[in-house]
């Protein structure tokens, strides 16, 4: 399990946390009725000037004289201010180019028409929201998206360089993969044939033609093993939560195509989505050779099977206590639990050439689910099982086929997210695909082209300061007993941080070894993807008999994100996020602590959220809290859960339980970063203020934090986030966190009873 800062997009093994152009930023605001735009003022001035030069009336000459006098007085004031500034050794205002630029960006993002004590998110982001309408093809737009677009543009330039010549075979594979994705003419020429051939190789599909009726296990092994789809369940190799120095086979629930079980079960509210999904299933089936009438009926049966899976799928908010859902057993015991398939045969194929026996240990997350899946398989018609298994393969591979498949998907995405994927340039899609396939080789190119090594040293220093601030606050918690407090301090001390990138990516031999065995051709994008699935299966098998590597990264260097991994007790900050607006070396420290500092505090606090707190300093899942402190912790977190459950988006309430861990991390991260900033000021003295913004540096810290989360989103995407995302929506990551901050309320003078100060603060760390 990994915890990431912000969801950036769908899919993938990581919880993804998951951005505006210069043109959008420079676009003038639409003037309100009765107001004047900058253009209107400029036009009026020009008209008056032409009349002045043409008529020279006495009144106009007098006015001109007065204007010149006022201009002279203003110039005199500016000169006086300049003299005073140079005589002032403290130089309390920062007038460097960097300070002036960032002050301008902050000012254009603000909405001065809103009181910070009424709605701090609107105060901080109202201007940004006006200037940043959703770009075509996007269901949401924010700082993370903007920065990822910048990173993608850099990678595009590097990969399309005609003089590309690398000593690393892995880097050459990266360019070949990217170019194969760009070969649209070749992809169109092949059409659906590559997938048709693959389906025939596996044994056929009842939707499109003859199929082998007695090959359930063979099809399951091919679909879930060779091609890494996840029908019914997902199998992976990862660190054992209760013995984190060893890897183990793990099995968990899976098998739904739509983002959440809610889309299947709340059929009235999601009728449009379910209809669009069935239309999509039918269209893909026909593109692969199915007949209209029979295809729709067979795909309707697959959809009904997915609805039954949704019924037994455990909601994410009920899976937050890993102690309760962790079940270690042998393959023999797994066989007894879910006897509808041969688990030893399946896992032996999946992890070939390793030899497995009935006594091989497995961790199962959700025994009730697997038991019910087994019963569901037993009572389902073989033809429906075949259709469902091949459908899982189809949906995994169609993004590598011609435009007809993309057009079919676009209709579903528009219903699901309110956006059209076709608006996304092909090169951006190909950069994302390359990042998924050869992310660390791509990261090598990115780091060598962009990363300032000094950033790594500065980031390490900031982490130390934030860790110290967190531990100091730990010492003042009245609800925690001394034994638990000491253990918590030891865990905080033991948190391992990784910054920028893993060292191996800059060593060509080591980088090549990582991708050794992955064959990449410039001629066949579809085959490159199949080779990737097969290669990833082999990599997974290779990990089982090896101990987890402390220095193994779960995120590529160019990613705009960060994460905490409880089984390693480590926090990771890729190079992709160590940039403006999160961090810039020549910006005020208030902004850096409010940006990347809060990110660091957020990830550190994950070690002590409702899930991370179950792991000890060695990364093992075990009880290490005293009962009194645990009860007090739960009381404090209940306040957070209740608070966030009251927030609404488009009339739909947040799930305070589902978002609890991230909300704890947001609140704790802000507090740790602000305390670290105060400690920095005590050591270095007050820093210069930005010109024109009218904010103290303490206020600037909170504005900088809030503006990281400026965001726009379609209603459909907002709904999807509410039912799937462990993070609260951006607006409430700001409002919820700051309304619990005594420091924020003090520096902005928000009285009790104002919208930002209810008088009841929820505080855990």
Swiss-Prot record:
Stretches in topological domain Lumenal: 82-765
Gene3D superfamilies, per the entry: Collagenase (Catalytic Domain) (3.40.390.10), Neutral endopeptidase , domain2 (1.10.1380.10)
Cofactor needs: Zn(2+)
Residues annotated as catalytic: 603, 666
SUPFAM superfamilies on file: Metalloproteases ('zincins'), catalytic domain (SSF55486)
Keyword Zinc recorded: yes
UniProt-annotated location(s): Golgi apparatus membrane; Cytoplasmic vesicle, Secretory vesicle membrane
Record-annotated membrane-spanning stretches: 61-81
Class of this enzyme: hydrolase
Any Pfam family the entry gives: Peptidase_M13_N
Keywords in alphabetical order: Cytoplasmic vesicle, Disulfide bond, Glycoprotein, Golgi apparatus, Hydrolase, Membrane, Metal-binding, Metalloprotease, Protease, Signal-anchor, Transmembrane, Transmembrane helix, Zinc
Residues involved in Zn(2+) binding: 602, 606, 662
Binding note for cofactor: Binds 1 zinc ion per subunit.
CDD domains: M13
Catalytic reactions on record: Hydrolysis of the 21-Trp-|-Val-22 bond in big endothelin to form endothelin 1
Disulfide-bond pairs as recorded: 94-99, 117-750, 125-710, 181-430, 639-762
InterPro entries: MetalloPept_cat_dom_sf (IPR024079), Peptidase_M13 (IPR000718), Peptidase_M13_C (IPR018497), Peptidase_M13_dom_2 (IPR042089), Peptidase_M13_N (IPR008753)
GO biological process: brain development; cardioblast differentiation; heart development; peptide hormone processing; protein processing
Main location: Golgi
Gene Ontology molecular function: any one: metal ion binding
PROSITE patterns: NEPRILYSIN, ZINC_PROTEASE
Similarity comment: Belongs to the peptidase M13 family.
Function, as annotated: Converts big endothelin-1 to endothelin-1. Also involved in the processing of various neuroendocrine peptides, including neurotensin, angiotensin I, substance P, proenkephalin-derived peptides, and prodynorphin-derived peptides. May play a role in amyloid-beta processing.
PANTHER family recorded: EEF1AKMT4-ECE2 READTHROUGH TRANSCRIPT PROTEIN-RELATED (PTHR11733:SF127), ZINC METALLOPROTEASE FAMILY M13 NEPRILYSIN-RELATED (PTHR11733)
The protein, known as: Endothelin-converting enzyme 2
Organism encoding this protein: Bos taurus (Bovine)
